């Protein structure tokens, strides 16, 4: 998102990945956006690889971050390209569920589905309190545990998993 210190999206590579996804899946809807997780190139790589190869099937973002970027909130069925820290595409994800609520409303299941750290709610709250505090500072907002958060679940849509 806007607060990520990564290279700009490699548009040609994003378009090539999207074309491969559309050709393979037959999907005829739009690509909503291309984005990176986190606020550094290293974090974007780490979290992107957790999507591609691991347990990450959820993410959270401040409601205010979408507003600041002029982007709509995600909706179930959206397709997005996940970028690495170098701006190159790693995967296509499909949003399966979206809930908006205060940061403090995160539950154990969501923390587990984010696939980060030890996957507990306590770890998740600590890590996201630090992350969202940095975002709030960058946006000129005051952080609180009641701040609005978009809790989004997704599935890996591309590349196809091989069994």
Please report, for each region that a protein language model flagged, where it lies by residue:
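Mixed-charge, low-complexity intrinsically disordered regions
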Residues: 1-92, 98-163
């Amino acid at each position: 998102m806007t607060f990520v210190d990564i290279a700009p999206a490699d548009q040609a590579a994003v378009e090539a990945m999207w074309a491969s996804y559309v050709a393979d899946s037959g999907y005829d809807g739009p690509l909503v956006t291309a984005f990176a997780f986190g606020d550094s190139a290293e974090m974007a790589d780490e979290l992107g690889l957790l999507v591609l190869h691991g347990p990450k099937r959820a993410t959270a973002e401040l409601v205010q971050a979408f507003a600041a970027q002029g982007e709509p909130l995600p909706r179930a069925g959206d397709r997005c390209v996940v970028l690495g820290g170098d701006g190159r595409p790693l995967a296509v994800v499909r949003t399966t569920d979206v809930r908006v609520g205060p940061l403090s409303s995160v539950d154990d299941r969501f923390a587990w589905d984010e696939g980060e750290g030890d996957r507990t709610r306590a770890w998740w709250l600590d890590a996201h309190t630090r992350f969202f505090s940095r975002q709030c500072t960058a946006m000129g907002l005051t952080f609180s545990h009641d701040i609005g958060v978009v809790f989004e679940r997704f599935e890996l849509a591309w590349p196809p998993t091989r069994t």
